[in-house]
């Protein structure tokens, strides 16, 4: 099954592909467009496409949301709208040493940040008052004393994760 780059499926199922398309400046990527003078999201990845009538095409337009969703892992829970319950599924690419993202919810600021050195990732998340979160430990990582998910009440939480595979 195919998905649009930056879409929910690509972010969740192929985070490394989404990351590469976001940071590279070779074909195909957002950086490719910028490197070649584009200031908007084109209809096609190819710059010489015969039919490219849209110079502001939403199909590839999830780059902004991708940062807080894809790397920060900040998602609402569909069963508790408005970020009363937050689903956290951060992604830690080995080639990136730090990241920080925030989202202003109706309950307050949600912040997800991390630093990475070698196999160690220090993850910090801030959950606003009257909210709670479920952190899904990413595949290939371990958290001492936890498996699968960690339930987090409102407040600031610092979690040390260790990469168990490259």
Residue ranges and their predicted role:
Residues 16-166:
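Non-catalytic C-terminal accessory modules of carbohydrate-active enzymes
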